[in-house]
Amino acid sequence: MKKGVTENGATESGAYKKLLKLWFFVAMVDCPGEPNELPRTIHELCEQREETLHELQLECVYCLKELTRIEVYDFARWDLRLVHRQGKPYGVCPICLRFYSKIRKYRRYEYSIYGCTLERRTRKQLVEVLIRCYCCQKPLCPIEKQRHVDQGQRFHRIAGQWTGRCLMCWRPTVPETQPDTDQQGSSFLQA
């Protein structure tokens, strides 16, 4: 049989071949229930290794520094995904996470919309939509999502995911940080 010709004599296009290879790769690697499936979260890794979260040791995929206990707990709590290199799982330290999140924001930004538009577009309430902080990648809680709506801030589509800012990464505006001058003067007189 000639290369690129199917059994019935039709020729396969290059895109079709790539799609077939991709499907074959996904079918071989990503089959659920396979014993050699690589864990995606820290909890899955703990189950596979039969270790507790307290015993788990991970390195940062970027700087190769060993993660501290708190960093491992945060990685698990924020439901971040493990990266596997040559069969070894890696996490990410907070410094590298912030650095590469900033790069991702600048390189892969798509567009921004308000909360009500996001609800209409996804046909879900904001509470149901997974929105991560674009600085630290922590999933936003309902209070943080509501703060965006209340203050008229937009959610951003970055690399195919919805993002905003968590309370820890929210930078206050100038009026929030500077006290009102009339109130400041009267407080000095009262003291």
Swiss-Prot record:
ZnF unnamed span: 60-96, 133-169
Q: What is the scientific name of the source organism?
A: Macaca mulata papillomavirus 1 (Rhpv 1)
Which Gene Ontology BP terms does the record give? Answer: DNA-templated transcription; regulation of DNA-templated transcription; symbiont-mediated perturbation of host apoptosis; symbiont-mediated perturbation of host ubiquitin-like protein modification; symbiont-mediated suppression of host innate immune response; symbiont-mediated suppression of host type I interferon-mediated signaling pathway
Note, other = Belongs to the low risk human alphapapillomavirus family. The cancer-causing human papillomavirus E6 protein has a unique carboxy terminal PDZ domain containing substrate but low risk E6s do not possess this domain.
Q: How does it assemble?
A: Forms homodimers. Interacts with ubiquitin-protein ligase UBE3A/E6-AP; this interaction stimulates UBE3A ubiquitin activity. Interacts with host TP53 and EP300; this interaction inhibits TP53 activity.
Q: Which InterPro entries match?
A: E6 (IPR001334), E6_sf (IPR038575)
Function (record text): Plays a major role in the induction and maintenance of cellular transformation. E6 associates with host UBE3A/E6-AP ubiquitin-protein ligase and modulates its activity. Sequesters tumor suppressor TP53 in the host cytoplasm and modulates its activity by interacting with host EP300 that results in the reduction of TP53 acetylation and activation. In turn, apoptosis induced by DNA damage is inhibited. E6 also protects host keratinocytes from apoptosis by mediating the degradation of host BAK1. May also inhibit host immune response.
Q: What is the predominant subcellular site recorded for this chain?
A: host cell
Q: Where is the signal peptide?
A: none
Q: Which GO terms describe its molecular function?
A: DNA binding; zinc ion binding
Q: Where in the cell is it found?
A: Host cytoplasm; Host nucleus
| Gene Ontology CC: one annotated term | host cell nucleus
> This protein is called what?
Protein E6
Q: What family does this chain come from, according to its entry? A: Belongs to the papillomaviridae E6 protein family.
